[in-house]
Amino acid sequence: MQKDSMFTANDPFLTSLISQFALPGICQKAERFGRGLINDTYLCEFDDRGNARKYILQRVNASVFTRPDQVMENVAIVTGHIVKKLRAEGIADPSLVTPSLVPTKNSALYLCDDTGAYWRMFNFIESGTVFDTVVDVKHAYEIGCGLGRFQSLVSDLSSDLLHDTLPGFHLTPRYLKEFDDALKAGVQNRIAGTVAEQAFVERHRQLAPVLTDLIGSKKIPLRVVHNDPKVNNVMIHNGTHEALCMIDLDTVKPGIVHFDFGDCVRSAANPMGEDATDLDTVKIDLTLVEAIASGYLREAGAFLTRTETTALPLSVQVITFELGIRFLADYLKGDTYFRIDYPDHNLHRARVQFKLLESIEASQERLASLVAQCAHPL
């Protein structure tokens, strides 16, 4: 892999890759794009008989996704399904409003370079922008709409068609067991110094199986879910400022809607963020929760079962607890998973999530009322 941040059209490495995709015109340049930490991403600019066209070239990170081929099959199934649904709604060119794969000249979904790395090409959606944090209440509403719209579009797509590319992801009891294992075999001085955090986990242990028990009892269905519904994965239209689509689809796989809703609210309705410096400022913003839930249920309410809707508020607690114990377990094990910026970073992250969970618990009755009101507006 070359290290330069920008390549000319004559660069042999990218020229070879790009030339294998079925694209019109001539590539003028390709430069690194975005701030993503997972995949190498390049914006490719083409001249098609005087018309400028843009595409996104990405290398799939095989160290994160051990089966890139399965990731690509999932992405192809989901994007293909969404494109068909949008065309049925009368949208002539869905590539303008949703991610879609550009095939290779051999009609493949991706190609492999000489090192075995997987590469794929997407359309570039010029009419949309993403934001790293929630701008205002209207933006929070559109985040909810974007997530609900995505889930609605794939609600009739069988999750059996998708690979489980991240086994065990969002299965909270698994993360609780990893925490328990870390208490037995972790860094001793870190174990000794986190008595208060360990006690917090013990007091909330009953949260771990809440969602998995619903899955096991088949009270809620497995569906196609996004699994990474953070703020900057909901693209906003530049003109209308409405949700356009969800991007970054590598994590799509079978799951339950609560994984997405709970994580979306946890991340978007915490204005101080995961690295808040002052724990006393960490709290759930119920105004943002109401906006997210209102937008989400406007789009998703029609296909959700009553049991699914009823369980939405508690999912925010479960997912927040889950992330907190993941941070704490990683700290106890010596920071082997999450990237850190300073020695106690993961411990601080865990404390932020636990503080947020306390706020969610204190607001649970109101949160449940907000979801109920959004699900059944007057």
Residue ranges and their predicted role:
Residues K218, N232-G273:
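Catalytic activation segment of kinase domains across protein kinase-like and atypical kinase folds
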Residues M1-E31:
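Juxta-kinase regulatory segment immediately upstream of eukaryotic protein kinase catalytic domains
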Residues H258-A302, V318-Y337:
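Active-site activation/catalytic loop segments of kinase-like enzymes and analogous catalytic loops
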Residues K29-F33, L37-D47, N51-K184, V257, ...:
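Conserved ATP-binding subdomain of kinase catalytic cores across diverse folds
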Residues N106-C112, V210-T212, L328:
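A short, acidic/glycine-rich surface segment
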Residues S5, E31-R35, I56-R59, F65-D69, ...:
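ATP-dependent phospho-/nucleotidyl transfer catalytic cores
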Residues I360-S363:
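Long, compositionally biased intrinsically disordered regions
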Residues T309-I319:
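Small/polar glycine-rich anion-binding or flexible loop at a beta-alpha turn
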